[in-house]
Swiss-Prot record:
This is Envelope glycoprotein B. A motif (Internalization motif) lies at residues 895-898. Envelope glycoprotein that plays a role in host cell entry, cell to-cell virus transmission, and fusion of infected cells. May be involved in the initial attachment via binding to heparan sulfate together with the gM/gN complex that binds heparin with higher affinity. Interacts with host integrin ITGB1, PDGFRA and EGFR that likely serve as postattachment entry receptors. Also participates in the fusion of viral and cellular membranes leading to virus entry into the host cell. Membrane fusion is mediated by the fusion machinery composed at least of gB and the heterodimer gH/gL. The gene is gB. Its main location: virion.
Length: 907
């Protein structure tokens, strides 16, 4: 059964092959006799392909076929053909009878000049104003009284100056008015301390009188001082007495004060700092700062002050508004003025008569070659009616007019009105546009002829959102950023002009290249037009124009490239390009052609040449290439392995865009101020605050003078000159006592003095202890202490008998002592009268006392003589007596006096 099935399959295949061969032979009749048998001469060269061909390759073998199998509808075998590559262009037939679209090459190409960036450039005049950082300067009057107290001590011929004390006090307001109207000051000053009025008089005159002000010898450019006393007075006191005198000097100083924006305080050249705005008038606290004590601040309208304090009977001047600030050490006065009349936030910096304003996307660039700087500003103008511009508006307009009259009046006209812009660095630019008269006339003619443009250029609107107010930002102190911006804009202009020239030259080169394409298209129009449009195009000349048509796309899977390029019926002849077979779409009829460039199929196979041996030909198809050696296919190679001739000059240029340089601050103004160890403003303010605190402390100080001394002083002063002299004497004694007590107290406070006192106290305690022990010993042993010669060195009592025997005897016992001589037995003592001692009479007692006195005198004289004799012979007997070391060594066993040689002989 299975054998029958296989037989049927084989028969069917044979029938199909025979039928296909019959159809093929009938369809190729009359076309070419060589088409039916030239493939029999093809070689069976090995089919090789480069491993690097990774692009899409379409082969006719959609299924696995044997090398000897015949291709459908042909007499060729699969081993006689090579696969194809359709990577870049598909296989197509571009031969046509007539084009459907007509084109021509441009002959009159015009290369216009390139404008790098669409910039609106205006020419004009620029006046630049900077922020005024100079402090506001004005005159200030300072009123003071200087009390100088000097103390001296008068010796017999010399007076010693012990020191001086200077105190600055503020005159009362009633005296200030007298000084301002008469240039005179009173010679006294009174102060209330703890409810008591203290009065100081000039030169201790005890009378209050006026003193005329006069110019001081010391003056400078910013301060003028008027005083009542130039020399300090002091008088010598009485001999051996102290003297303290008072010198009172009135001082009026006209100095300079400075205040910077926003004028919250001002500082004088004398070092005083006032936390009040110099423009505060009592009603404008919202606009002007006030930080002092309101009770000590006074404002007087239409106030009169002498024109010269140093000249008597000087003329009076009326001041509109004068402020007075009363302090503990001075009274400060100044004239109150309107801020807008005496200050200005802006000051003139520079003018540029030739300025170019370029308009960027969000900003204006004002470039001046004279200043070598470019300033950036927003497109919004500053309102011309801004109050901050009131002080410079007229000046700026006049400067612009002067520059225009000097440089442009003959050839230029003003173009628009004056505009104001604020730069990124805080500068203010007044801008006046100008334009040549000839251009203005042309614009006027164009405006008259145009129905839509019937008006000239007018001033930009400064209302609404187009205008802004001047900000309060501070000007930068370094304008390097403006010079950097100018450098960048200059380089940008040069580079953009160079790029414009390059672009224009590129256009000229493209025009010439187009002429070359035109001439080359006469040779192969389809190839030239396909290269230009980057797609397959069929082109043919129709006179002076080109007819274009789309190429006919064929069945890509049916394309086969033959391996052999030899012509069978013509020995020695070879095809100049490989032969291919293909089918049109929706047709199974096999067509023959030759492989053209870029996968184009050339109809027919008549393109032959004489065979040249040896030969090497490579035909490109997509990203691969067919290599034929001696007109036989050898292999497919990767197209990337073959170097290319690159004649393309790439040109990728972009114009430089606008860049607005920002003002960068590495450290802010606050950080720079904080980096300093000393801040003069803060120091002066702190010092001023410290001085203000002193006046509050003075009210709480209690007079340390005792009430009784004050009463005594009043009592002595009431007794006249004699009482005053007695009071001076008492004061001197009291001062001496107070000085001694103060010295003792100071000595005790000293660590060395306290230590000395401790040592003295210890010594006193030791002395008291020694005295106490002596008195105790005297009470216990009166005879031994009062009559030391009665006791020998060994502790025995010396009697009037034989001292040689008794000195060596032991002392008698207590029972055998003389105190018990009346006792006869061991029993208790008897009270018998016979044992009692006989009474002594007064005469006997008196004689006994005299005998004791004589005995004491003799014994003492004898002892003194013995001591002197021992001193003379001490050097001879020094070695026999114990020294200090022996005494210390045997101090525990006691010490007995050793007898010398004289005593031994006597024994």
């Amino acid at each position: 059964m299975e054998s029958r099935i296989w037989c049927l399959v084989v028969c069917v295949n044979l029938c199909i092959v025979c039928l296909g061969a019959a159809v093929s032979s009938s369809s190729t009749r009359g076309t070419s006799a060589t088409h039916s048998h030239h493939s029999s001469h093809t070689t069976s060269a090995a089919h090789s392909r480069s491993g690097s061909v990774s692009q899409r390759v379409t082969s006719s073998q959609t299924v696995s076929h044997g090398v000897n199998e015949t291709i459908y509808n042909t007499t060729l075998k699969y081993g006689d053909v090579v696969g194809v590559n359709t990577t870049k262009y598909p296989y197509r037939v571009c031969s046509m009878a007539q084009g459907t679209d007509l084109i021509r090459f441009e002959r009159n190409i015009v290369c216009t000049s390139m404008k790098p960036i669409n910039e609106d450039l205006d020419e004009g005049i620029m006046v630049v104003y900077k922020r005024n950082i100079v402090a506001h300067t004005f005159k200030v009057r300072v009123y003071q009284k200087v009390l100088t107290f000097r103390r001296s001590y008068a010796y017999i011929h010399t007076t010693y100056l012990l020191g001086s004390n200077t105190e600055y006090v503020a005159p009362p307001m009633w005296e200030i008015h007298h000084i301002n109207s008469h240039s005179q000051c009173y010679s006294s000053y009174s102060r209330v301390i703890a409810g008591t009025v203290f009065v100081a008089y000039h030169r201790d005159s005890y009378e209050n009188k006026t003193m005329q002000l006069m110019p001081d010898d010391y003056s400078n450019t910013h301060s003028t001082r008027y005083v009542t006393v130039k020399d300090q007075w002091h008088s010598r006191g009485s001999t051996w007495l102290y003297r303290e005198t008072c010198n009172l000097n009135c001082m009026v100083t006209i100095t300079t004060a400075r205040s910077k924006y926003p004028y919250h305080f001002f500082a004088t050249s004398t070092g005083d700092v006032v936390d009040i705005s110099p423009f505060y008038n009592g009603t404008n606290r919202n606009a002007s700062y006030f930080g002092e004590n309101a009770d000590k601040f006074f404002i007087f309208p239409n106030y009169t002050i002498v024109s010269d304090f140093g000249r008597p009977n000087s003329a009076l001047e009326t001041h509109r508004l004068v402020a007075f600030l009363e302090r503990a050490d001075s009274v400060i006065s100044w004239d109150i003025q309107d801020e807008k009349n005496v200050t200005c936030q802006l000051t003139f910096w520079e003018a540029s008569e030739r300025t170019i304003r370029s308009e960027a996307e969000d900003s204006y660039h004002f470039s001046s070659a004279k200043m070598t700087a470019t300033f950036l500003s927003k497109k919004q103008e500053v309102n011309m009616s801004d109050s901050a511009l009131d002080c410079v508006r007229d000046e700026a307009i006049n400067k612009l007019q002067q520059i225009f009259n000097t440089s442009y009046n003959q050839t230029y006209e003003k173009y628009g009105n004056v505009s104001v812009f604020e730069t990124t660095g805080g500068l203010v630019v007044f801008w006046q546009g100008i334009k040549q008269k000839s251009l203005v006339e042309l614009e006027r003619l164009a405006n008259r002829s145009s129905l839509n443009l019937t008006h000239n250029r007018t001033k930009r609107s400064t209302d609404g959102n187009n205008a802004t107010h001047l900000s309060n930002m501070e000007s930068v102190h370094n304008l390097v950023y403006a010079q950097l911006q100018f450098t960048y804009d200059t380089l940008r202009g040069y580079i953009n002009r160079a790029l414009a020239q390059i672009a224009e030259a590129w256009c000229v080169d493209q025009r010439r290249t187009l002429e070359v394409f035109k001439e080359l298209s006469k040779i192969n129009p389809s190839a030239i037009l396909s290269a230009i449009y980057n797609k397959p195009i069929a082109a043919r000349f129709m006179g002076d124009v080109l007819g274009l048509a789309s190429c006919v796309t064929i069945n890509q899977t049916s394309v086969k490239v033959l391996r052999d390029m030899n012509v069978k019926e013509s020995p020695g002849r070879c095809y100049s390009r490989p032969v291919v077979i293909f089918n049109f779409a929706n047709s199974s009829y096999v067509q023959y052609g030759q492989l053209g460039e870029d996968n184009e199929i050339l109809l027919g196979n008549h393109r032959t040449e004489e065979c040249q041996l040896p030969s090497l030909k490579i035909f490109i198809a997509g990203n691969s290439a067919y290599e034929y050696v001696d007109y036989l296919f050898k292999r497919m190679i990767d197209l990337s392995s073959i170097s290319t001739v690159d004649s393309m000059i790439a040109l990728d240029i972009d114009p430089l865009e606008n860049t607005d340089f920002r003002v960068l601050e590495l450290y802010s103004q606050k950080e720079l101020r904080s980096s300093n160890v000393f801040d003069l403003e803060e120091i002066m303010r702190e010092f001023n605050s410290y001085k203000q605190r002193v006046k509050y402390v003075e009210d709480k100080v209690v007079d340390p003078l005792p009430p009784y001394l004050k009463g005594l002083d009043d009592l002595m002063s009431g007794l006249g000159a004699a009482g005053k002299a007695v009071g001076v004497a008492i004061g001197a004694v009291g001062g001496a006592v107070a000085s001694v007590v103060e010295g003792v107290a100071t000595f005790l406070k000293n660590p060395f003095g306290a230590f000395t006192i401790i040592l003295v106290a210890i010594a006193v305690v030791i002395i008291i202890y020694l005295i106490y022990t002596r008195q105790r010993r005297l009470c216990m042993q009166p005879l031994q202490n009062l009559f030391p010669y009665l006791v020998s060195a060994d502790g025995t009592t010396v009697t009037s008998g034989n001292t040689k025997d008794t000195s060596l005897q032991a002392p008698p016992s207590y029972e055998e002592s003389v105190y018990n001589s009346g006792r006869k037995g061991p029993g208790p003592p008897s009270s018998d009268a016979s044992t009692a001692a006989p009474p002594y009479t007064n005469e006997q007692a008196y004689q006994m006392l005299l005998a004791l006195v004589r005995l004491d005198a003799e014994q003492r004289a004898q002892q003194n003589g013995t001591d002197s004799l021992d001193g003379q012979t001490g050097t001879q007997d020094k070695g026999q007596k114990p020294n200090l070391l022996d005494r210390l060594r045997h101090r525990k066993n006691g010490y007995r006096h050793l007898k010398d040689s004289d005593e031994e002989e006597n024994v």
